[in-house]
Amino acid sequence: MSSLLDKTRMLNRILQKSGTEPVDFEDICDLLSDVLACNVYIISRKGKILGSKFYSGFECEEVREVVLKENRFPDFYNNKLLNVNETLSNSPNHDKCVFDNLKDCSINNKLSTIVPINGNRERLGTLLLARFDKEFTDEDLILAEYSATIIGLEILRSKQDQIEEEARKKAVVQLAIGTLSYSELEAVEHIFNELDGTEGLLVASKIADKVGITRSVIVNALRKFESAGVIESRSLGMKGTHIRILNDKLLEELKKIK
């Protein structure tokens, strides 16, 4: 039987293996499921399942259907989890389905342990463990809470990466817009008003006639955006030019100019 120290070292190896890359939540679920002999779910604050692992022989069809098909827990159940502010261990289901109290659970003596995932003074999600017949020990709970701390740090890092990526995309769009002349900017506004969503067909001559500018102004504006990686364009000959927006901040930044 592995000691608590051995199990903790296994978790540390996942961190060391990842280096600068994000930790794979599935790896944490696999390890916890193996060493704790239980089902493991990592759930975001909004109920999305970030990682999960069913322990061999401990499969609940109701939960499996939710995990595999929906990839999220029902809102009412997720709200119950969020109301747990500190580790709740060995909570019995009283032989009732956790998703429907009117239905009997197909497996008797199910015990759940709920570990809040917190970081930066906010609730980030929940680590949910489920086992049958055998209670979680203090050692199990120490490992679960340590895992929740690791997961919390990874969620925070992921959120920070997302914020930085959003800022980078905005900066790229702003730089691309800054290279346009007044007439090119006017052309760009009309071009993207003509598009249906994030991609569509553009006939430069029609827009040139409509706005009262030369076709070359439109072509130059599109080239500048394409070289900045903001859009992708493909000539279809007489039919026109197919344009696809690659940077989802483009339309948002153009609206600000208006």
Curated annotation (Swiss-Prot):
Keyword field: Cytoplasm, DNA-binding, Repressor, Transcription, Transcription regulation
Pfam families: CodY, HTH_CodY
Cited InterPro entries: CodY (IPR014154), GAF-like_dom_sf (IPR029016), GTP_trans_reg_CodY_C (IPR013198), Transc_reg_CodY_N (IPR010312), WH-like_DNA-bd_sf (IPR036388), WH_DNA-bd_sf (IPR036390)
SUPFAM superfamilies, A to Z: GAF domain-like, Winged helix' DNA-binding domain
PANTHER family in the record: GLOBAL TRANSCRIPTIONAL REGULATOR CODY (PTHR40062:SF1), GTP-SENSING TRANSCRIPTIONAL PLEIOTROPIC REPRESSOR CODY (PTHR40062)
Similarity field: Belongs to the CodY family.
Protein name per its UniProtKB record: Global transcriptional regulator CodY
Encoding gene (name): codY
